Design a protein with these regions (language model features):
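Active-site mouth loops of central-metabolism enzymes
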Residues: 1-13, 63-71, 94-100, 122
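Catalytic alpha/beta core domains of metabolic enzymes, predominantly
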Residues: 85-131
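Non-catalytic positions within long, well-ordered alpha-helices that form the structural scaffold/packing
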Residues: 19-20, 79, 115
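Active-site-proximal loop/turn and secondary-structure-junction residues that shape catalytic pockets
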Residues: 30-34, 64-68, 90-94, 127-129
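Hydrophobic faces of well-ordered beta-strands that scaffold small-molecule active sites
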Residues: 26-28, 58-64, 84-88, 121-124
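Conserved, mostly hydrophobic/aromatic
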Residues: 11, 18, 29, 86
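Alpha-helix-loop-beta-strand connector modules within alpha/beta enzyme cores
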Residues: 37-62, 109-116
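Catalytic cores of alpha/beta
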Residues: 68-81, 129-131
Length: 131
């Protein structure tokens, strides 16, 4: 078995394991069953609903990072589900051989969306320049 959960069942199992060990907050990256990263709102909805059912009261933090090459609009899809929190990446950085773009207009748009929808940001700082 791979170390990263891909399927809905794997995601719920790993979330429940963390919850049972005392986790109150679970950060969620979503993939298709083959492991391909996705920001598909409906896939997030199904997984987040299943985790909430298995882990009553847990706070979920969906990732808005997605994958390199995704548009800001794609990356923001999970915020359309109005989670309590979501990630807000604090700057551009190298990600393997790719560049993970988080320029000022993108960061402002993400922050604005979160503010308008009462979503608390989890600030993600990948290097010292993001502080």
């Amino acid at each position: 078995m791979q170390a990263v959960p891909y399927t809905i069942e794997e995601m719920v199992r790993e979330a429940k394991s963390a919850f049972d060990a005392g986790a109150a907050i679970i950060h969620v990256h979503v993939r298709w069953d083959d492991g391909t990263p996705t920001q598909d709102k409906e896939r997030f909805r199904v997984i987040m609903d299943a985790i909430r059912e298995a882990c009553p009261g847990v706070i979920l933090i969906p990732s808005t990072g997605g994958a390199t090459g995704m548009t800001p609009e794609e990356r923001l899809q999970p915020t359309e589900l109005f989670p309590e929190m979501a990630t807000l990446d604090c700057g551009t950085c190298n990600f393997g051989d790719d560049i993970f773009v988080n320029d000022m207009p993108t960061m402002r748009a993400f922050g604005k969306r979160m503010l308008e929808n009462n979503i608390k940001p989890e600030y993600e700082c990948f290097e010292i320049g993001h502080l």
